């Protein structure tokens, strides 16, 4: 006989076990989009303790809708090896242009990221950063519904040696530093230019403040670089670059 209270206990106890186990991290990633999940995957494979915090119910960022709701994405030659790493199928459309199914990309990256050892907490919003001695050293979290309803509920803190802002176009985590005058400006993303946007996404993936990295569209927003639309190679390469740099700094 099934008991309702046992079901409840199983969920509550297992969830809070995960939460307690992830209050002290090597890396806290904010945003479970393509660059965030790829960063998490490579970090976990490299031996880092990492969790991703996503304010939405679903993960995957902008992958699902492809271009204008046509659920296909394009990846360029330079990033094809990451599709191979995740065992994602693709077809060559023209030389240097590879098309993949957006649903397969989102679900496969998510699955392999979790299986690599990354814990993803969805419906958890990061509302601030922990900054000590001029260095980002953690995140401040609350339930997304609490933020949506405007209830005055104090948050909790997660400590991390590094934080990655993978929140996309708004660079929402880096905005906390701007708000407090710890960085001078965030110019925002430029107009659409796929070639330059893809190139600069990787170049702009860096530590913008001690302890804080930016990836994906957050990297371009912080640097004022162009957007690129439904081509995702830059997102994947950006996540991998951040992961590799952080692993080196962690000595892993």
Swiss-Prot record:
Instruction: List its EC numbers.
Output: 2.4.2.59
- Any Pfam family hit: Thi4
Reactions this protein catalyses: hydrogen sulfide + glycine + NAD(+) = ADP-5-ethyl-4-methylthiazole-2-carboxylate + nicotinamide + 3 H2O + H(+)
Q: Which residues bind NAD(+)?
A: 35, 54-55, 62, 126, 152-154, 217
Q: In which pathway does it act?
A: Cofactor biosynthesis; thiamine diphosphate biosynthesis
Q: Whom does it interact with, and what assembly results?
A: Homooctamer; tetramer of dimers.
* HAMAP family hit by this protein: Thi4 (MF_00304)
Q: What NCBIfam families does UniProt report for this protein, alphabetically?
A: sulfide-dependent adenosine diphosphate thiazole synthase (TIGR00292)
Known role: Involved in the biosynthesis of the thiazole moiety of thiamine. Catalyzes the conversion of NAD and glycine to adenosine diphosphate 5-(2-hydroxyethyl)-4-methylthiazole-2-carboxylate (ADT), an adenylated thiazole intermediate, using free sulfide as a source of sulfur.
What's the name of the protein? Thiamine thiazole synthase
> Which organism encodes this protein?
Pyrococcus furiosus (strain ATCC 43587 / DSM 3638 / JCM 8422 / Vc1)
Q: Which lineage ranks, top first, belong to the organism behind this chain?
A: Archaea, Methanobacteriati, Methanobacteriota, Thermococci, Thermococcales
Q: Which gene encodes it?
A: thi4
